[in-house]
């Protein structure tokens, strides 16, 4: 739309969840399979490795599009920044990057701001601290990215459950809408589905159907009978 020759690449992996202490992709793959019940994450980590390789011989300045209101894009930015050394970088900050359409994104072209040495050091130090903590989740708190435990979203999920049977997908959607209304996009349906399955297996919810499929599973709060 803007008739620009820029090449666009993205991180693929979602560093808002899973182990980050090392760059061993196999550790992340095994974690996603165990905690989230998703197989095939090796393809995601492979694409992220290709993404990083694109910067090895790069001479041109890079413009990074960042949203501090979206955990996945913010975490992905910090992870990327920790790997690219001192290449010149400019930043475009967009509040809701993942749902911004092409017409809206075009309005941000030309508004990039050079990343200062001080800000680069701050972001890199933040990621190093998150790596040391190596928590199961990263979430947004204000404008900061902080560590969180795997149960972080459980109370929100349970607040949308009722004593009537509901599709798992309906509870997940209600929780995502809650994020949307708050203007902070904390996580996606992959993690929320996995947490609902764990809550059901722990007896916090009753269930019927296929716990691994949001549209084939129904949940409700345990009855008092």
Per-segment meaning from a language model:
Residues 210-225:
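Short, cationic-aromatic polyanion-contact patches
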């Amino acid at each position: 739309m803007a008739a620009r020759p820029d090449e666009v690449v993205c991180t693929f992996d979602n560093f808002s969840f899973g182990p980050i202490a090392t760059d061993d992709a196999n550790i992340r793959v095994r974690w996603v399979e165990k905690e989230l019940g998703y197989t095939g994450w090796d393809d995601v980590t492979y694409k992220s490795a290709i993404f990083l390789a694109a910067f090895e011989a790069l001479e041109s300045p890079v413009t990074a599009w960042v949203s501090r209101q979206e955990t996945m894009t913010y975490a992905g930015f910090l992870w990327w920044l920790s790997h690219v050394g001192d290449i010149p970088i400019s930043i475009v900050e967009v509040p809701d990057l993942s749902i911004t359409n092409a017409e809206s994104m075009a309005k941000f072209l030309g508004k990039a701001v050079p990343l200062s040495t001080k800000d680069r050091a701050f972001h890199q130090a933040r990621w190093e601290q998150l790596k040391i903590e190596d928590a199961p989740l990263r979430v947004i708190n204000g404008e900061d990215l902080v560590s969180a435990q795997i149960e972080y979203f459980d109370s929100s999920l349970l607040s949308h459950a009722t004593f009537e049977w509901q599709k798992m997908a309906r509870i997940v959607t209600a929780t995502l809408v809650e994020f949307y209304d708050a203007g902070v996009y904390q996580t996606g349906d992959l993690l929320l589905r996995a947490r609902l399955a764990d809550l059901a297996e722990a007896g916090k919810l009753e269930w019927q159907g296929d716990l691994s499929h949001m549209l084939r599973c129904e949940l409700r709060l345990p009855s008092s009978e």
